[in-house]
Amino acid sequence: MRKKLLVVSLLLSVLEIAITAQEKPARRMNYFPEGRDIVCVNGQNRYTRALYGGHTLFRLETSDRPIFATYNNEKSKNIRFYLTHRGLTLRLDSTDYCEARYQGGWRGYKVRDKRWGSAELQVNSLARLDNEGAIWQFKASGFEGDVKLSVKMCQTAVLKMNRGGDLGLVPRSNFDPSQDEKGLKTLEWDATGETYLVFSDNEMLEHPTTEKGREIYTLTDEGRKAIVERVEFITPDPYINTLGANICAAADGTWDGQTWQHGAIGWRVPLAGWRGGYSGDALGWPERQKSHFDAYTKSIVTDVPQIYPQPSQDTKNLLARAEKKWGTGMYSNGYLCRLPGRNDVMNHYDMNLNFFDELFWHFRYDTDTTYLRKMWPYIKLHLEWEKRNWDADGDHLYDAYCCIWASDALYYNGGNVTHSSAYNYKGNRFAARIAELLGEDPTPWQQEADAILKAMNRRLWLKDEGHWAEFEDLMGEKRLHKSAAVWSIYTPIDCDACTSEQAWMATEYVDREIPHIPIRIKDSDMDGKYQTVATTNWLPYDWSTNNVAHEEVMNTALAYFQAGRSEQGFNLLMADILDGMFLGQSPGNFGQISYYDKARSEAYRDFADNVGISSRTLINGLFGILPDALFGKCYIKPAFPKEWDSCSIRTPFLSYKFHRTATQDIYEIEQNFAQPLQMIVKTSIGRGVFVETEGISDKKQIIVVDRTNLPKGKRNTIVNSSRTLDESQQYLTKMGLDEPTPSAKFKTIDISKYFNANVDDIFKNEYLSPRPPYTTLEMPLHGIGQWCHPERMVTIEDDGFRAKINKKLFDTGLGFSFISPTTGHNIVYTSLWDNYPDSIDIPLKGKANAAWLLMAGSTNEMQSRIDNGLVIANYTDGTQDTLRLENPINWCPIEQDYYLDGLAFTAAEKRPYRVHLGSGTVSRHLAPIVGICNWEGKTRKDLYSAEPQIIENGAAQMLKMPLNPKKSLRRLQLRTLSNDVVIGIMGITLESAPK
């Protein structure tokens, strides 16, 4: 029996290694940089690079070869071309050779085929700006004799597409011709020389005269160039040089004529928050910014006072989020509503923080006092609303109510949160300065800003570890959650809620603790050179709590640049550029989700959140242009790689050329701000120390930094994190993950008189108290789910486990058993919920080397990398040993298995033994044996996806708690520490060494 178990264990271990060390396959470079173009030869991606044209949802989908589709809901069309020469007709997407180029809103092709001899066809495509249409330019050269072009246009294979038919959401084949070529239209023309084809959204195809076609094409291209040539980067790095035109085109794709949208394609809906609104100022569209801000300030509630006290949780959503009711704290004066120009449409987000941060950034570019005065009432309303709702206890630290992109499944239970506190610090600091400029008393806002910063440093900054905590609990033990997400690093840095030394140290936390994932490239010397990052190291996975998201990577790169860590920032920037724009399916794409995300993989194109923060990462970060018009200054704080000796940037508001000599850094600057600003160059000398070289406020100037006069950089203490994963055997033993000792003696302990529940009661209960006294996002009523999905439920059923019990003993198959009943209560639960005691003492006698514990309970992503509970062994001499129950090391959620990949999702080298409650099966690798399903109960066969691995009927777990064999036991105490969770013991068996 032992041999059979050993063989099974070894086989499962091999399977576990295969599952938990899963790098995604390396990709070949799809695209390469050449000047401002992104180029591919004989590429295979279809309908992946969108050209946007005007400011509607219409777009032209282009491919790596000249086959196209238009998207316009139910009017979407497939458009394909044919060339006929010497009696041979070829579809243009099937030739021997095709070079495709993309540059900000334009896609061009050089097409050749051996059957044409030395002839070549140039195809240029544009989406029109003046209507929902497109134009193609054809230039045929080297053809001997007649050459004709023809076009077929028909309905696409699928019309109704999820998320607008975006990448990663629907198959690209949806844009192929419909099977019956429904609505087929054709056109043929003489293709000699230069010819054109025009598509208009009234479903017409037109072959105009060359003169008319050239006029339309030139006008369209000039309009495109006015958009994409506003920003230019010239650097030693060819990848960076492509970004100016492409980011402008992507940003323009997210503009609807009045406001910035959530995305250009998949999320093409109005959105006041997130980071899309940074694009306008960073890329030099101040008129668009004012349009955006004007539209949404009309969405701010101004005539609904708060009349209902906090909390105001929604019973229909099982108390997980705020009730949508006018006059509650959230839905009252100061609240920013969902749609532009309307202050009567509720949303479930706090969009205020991001929206007003973008407004404050606008004032850094342009301190127009007339516009300041116009916006000032809304700024005051916003800050009053934030204070009233999210700092209701007045301690100057703020709760976070889904106020950043990573908001789904993110909830803080009324706690004190780093990122929201940082935003409010900045908001109050800017309000104080604006008040001063407008002749008002700045004191109230300055005092609040000072108090927030003091509280953040005193309560959220981890001095010994050199970074901010994610949050501080309001309830229960009021503990700090130290495993911070990247947003809890980059937000306080971006909001200047820190010293430059703190910023440097906080980015070192990212180096140590945030998962890094290598960018794998086939047949390239860049293979593995760069690494991208996940947003957190939290488990179990839920959407937006542990992802590889382009916008989060870019914002983290910006934080590195701001902290003065230029090399690390550039490496992260390059990782993201390669991942999304050159290895991905869409050239020059500013997408949302990375290929390396184990739940979604590559998804979405030109997502506004990424476009906005990427524009800032490049302009405010890499090139370091930091206007501060509120104080009449503009800082240039470059973060170039050390090998760059020259580069330049051109934007509508400021351009400069940089070059380095043996001893000097020279900046040739030309500014075009609305108000002339004093130029100041900030040079990093390491570890958060910068030296300023002052210029003047003239339009054109040269600033020279003499590096021989720079002081040596300051050295600070290097902080080591205590949470770096320990893979030693001693650590595994300490965390209860050891195997049974061969030939050990086991003594089962009857703890049935302490049982207070059935194990499957856990999600049948209503957990009503204690709950926060303030409106917040919190655990749903039944102790499972999250605010986006409060209705989530699973079946926990222990019939199979009980059926395996023989004479009150459950045989683990590992050489020992637990006493457990076949009917009635079979667990003692503890919790900070009032439903159960927060701790339980179980008397014990004798001596033992270890205590085997059969346990079950709950945990979630907001309780990850923190002790959820303690098991304390008390000895008769007054001493004790403690087993810490930490998610995900040795504490598992009853309803699911952890997905582990050795990258973004890591735990200890060994998993805890799990006991399937539906069958009694025992294994460290339960999911491959009993199967998994999704939240909806549908069977899942893909063990390589991070999506939740729900175990039907649930699973308990077993831990081996080490004890001191020389000491006599008095009692075992189970104590729950984390809010929201339930922890229970089903059985105890003592292990003693063999004589």
Enumerate the language-model features and the residues they cover.
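Acidic, contiguous internal or C-terminal segments within carbohydrate-active enzymes
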Residues: 113-159, 428, 654-685, 834-852, ...
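Non-catalytic C-terminal accessory modules of carbohydrate-active enzymes
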Residues: 72-79, 83-131, 555-733
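Substrate-binding groove/exosite segments of carbohydrate-active enzymes
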Residues: 222-374, 480-498, 528-563, 567-574, ...
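An extended acidic
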Residues: 25-111, 200-212, 216-231, 236, ...
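Catalytic cores of carbohydrate-active enzymes
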Residues: 307-309, 391-406, 413-419, 423-511, ...
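N-terminal/edge-of-domain interface segments
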Residues: 723-995
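Acidic/His metal-coordination segments adjacent to aromatic residues that form catalytic metal sites
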Residues: 254-255, 322-345, 399-417, 593-601
